[in-house]
Amino acid sequence: MKIKTRFAPSPTGYLHVGGARTALYSWLFSRHLGGEFVLRIEDTDLERSTQEAIDAIMDGMNWLNLDWDEGPYFQTKRFDRYNAVIDQMLDAGTAYRCYCSKERLEALREAQMANGEKPRYDGHCRDSQCTHGADEPSVVRFRNPQEGSVIFDDKIRGPIEFSNQELDDLIIRRTDGSPTYNFCVVIDDWDMEITHVIRGEDHINNTPRQINILKALGAPVPEYAHVSMILGDDGKKLSKRHGAVGVMQYRDDGYLPEALLNYLVRLGWSHGDQEIFSIEEMTQLFTLDAVSKSASAFNTEKLQWLNHHYINSLPPEQVAVHLSWHVEQLGIDTRNGPELVEIVKLLGERCKTLKEMAESCRYFYEEFDAFDVDAAKKHLRPIARQPLEAVKVKLAAITEWTTENVHNAIQGTADELGVGMGKVGMPLRVAVTGVGQSPGMDVTVHAIGQARTLARIDKALAFISEREAQQ
């Protein structure tokens, strides 16, 4: 049997982390077993579905590199197929027209609730012999079995059973002729030959209804696996406050797709005590029986830790491709400065996100208007004039601009003045970067370049003189 899974988001908002995890699990399951992965856009909610949301879903999937073998399919383009099946069901007697008014249904609901009963359709039109006009508005309901139960073996949760008496006759076509969500899903899974449905636990109650429709159609029933929800670190339902933002927001905030994928796969799935997984390892190791039934808590600090790991473990060239987007967003012109690959090597250990890295690398490419106040107050004092002037002479004398020669110039200055490296390095750091923290001065000065370094030392010396004159 060819394994076939699907990811079927509704385009009513962004692709959030819960949806991304579901997509990842479905993708990994199919890839692990050499199957196929289908992308389906469930856009039957015409009022809430937007092209912007569709674009956000596609962007998120592409950024995460979760490729699909079929699709994207759109339910709104399959209405003729759904309605053809509904008409066949009407002819076969597995569906019927319901003419109950909204007023009758509301009164029924209120009466049931007043009696402490679960609100459900009472089957008034199920076996009715009364006639109605051809143009009289009606919905179409599925004739759900009234006896027995629906039992399915959830691949994450184990056997789940629903009594058919608890299931009312589901509306499968509205009065306006449009098919409903639960019905469209069934026909899609049937037509697309989906073998395994992996989705959120909020769909568990839909499953027995969908199974009954499939059985009424004589269609194969796929396997089902329902993943638990993601909670905030305070145990409450995930919200924007915890990190329930669109996947592309994580891109904007400077996270690598490899880090987010690694984080998402561990939100409910485990393999021993291993924390770091490449996408190849995930694909090789992923199984549904290792997915937890318990809810998972979102932890931003853990995601940042993983992101820092991948910034420093992936090939710098690969990280630089992602960094370039952030640098462009800040309007930094990198043509007159080091390659971004060098920035990744220089700043990787110091940065948890690429956004932080992009913001920190400005001084390699742009002149700064002012020195950091605290750093200048501490290190650009009159006592710093001598080491800055001395190191400038040695840096200016370098004919081959290498990291080693830069280091020797700084070290030689400290040796000649009989002071520690910090007495030279810290004023030099503030002079050439404008801030009090940076990578080692030899690699930083080398990356900034000789001419720019000498000009900035002159700027710092002028700053010291101005400051001295004001005192």
Swiss-Prot record:
Report the GO molecular function annotations: ATP binding; glutamate-tRNA ligase activity; tRNA binding; zinc ion binding
Q: How the cofactor binds, per note?
A: Binds 1 zinc ion per subunit.
Q: Where does ATP bind?
A: K240
Q: Which branch of life, at top level?
A: Bacteria
Q: Where is this motif: 'HIGH' region?
A: 9-19
- GO biological process per UniProt: glutamyl-tRNA aminoacylation
**GO CC annotation:** cytosol
Q: Which CDD domains match?
A: GluRS_core
Q: What is its EC number?
A: 6.1.1.17
Q: Which SUPFAM superfamilies match?
A: An anticodon-binding domain of class I aminoacyl-tRNA synthetases, Nucleotidylyl transferase
Please list the reactions this protein catalyses: tRNA(Glu) + L-glutamate + ATP = L-glutamyl-tRNA(Glu) + AMP + diphosphate
- State how it assembles: Monomer.
* Similarity comment: Belongs to the class-I aminoacyl-tRNA synthetase family. Glutamate--tRNA ligase type 1 subfamily.
Protein name stated in the entry? Glutamate--tRNA ligase
Q: Which organism is it from?
A: Yersinia pseudotuberculosis serotype IB (strain PB1/+)
